[in-house]
Amino acid sequence: MTETTPRPPRVLAIGAHPDDVEFHMAGTFILLGRAGYELHYMSLANGCCGSTEHGPGEAAEIRRHEAMAAAAMIGAKFHPSLVNDMEIVYDVPTAARLAAVVRQVAPRILLTHPPNDYMEDHEATCRLAVTA
């Protein structure tokens, strides 16, 4: 019989948009990493509408690279976005796709937006994360 090293507890941070994890939950996320948690980073939407200088495809690619760099900087595993900007809706297909990520990560702690927020996308992300 071989002994296995127990996997550290995991935390999954789910933001609505690229940079939401950094702006809204990075401090807590980093402290949990320092406390021994395995960190997992995800933006639900890809940031394709986040630029006035670049088209949607290029903007999404830029935002993906920025998010990957942010995740790497704090030692988090990056999980790709599931939807385009303006497509964060509380529906069964999106909840099922997010649930697959949550099941894969199996976090002890899930960080996301509050249920009452200044942006509808944030509220929908919260509902999806809680459902998942």
Explain the meaning of each model-derived region.
Residues 1-105:
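Active-site rim/loop-helix segments in enzyme catalytic domains that contact anionic ligands
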Residues 67, 110, 129:
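Hydrophobic/aromatic pocket-lining and membrane-interface residues
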Residues 87-88, 115-122:
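Acidic, metal-coordinating catalytic cores used for nucleic-acid/nucleotide bond scission
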Residues 14, 112, 119:
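Active-site-adjacent beta-strand anchor residues
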Residues 94, 98-116, 125-126:
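Proline-aspartate-enriched helix->loop->beta-strand connector
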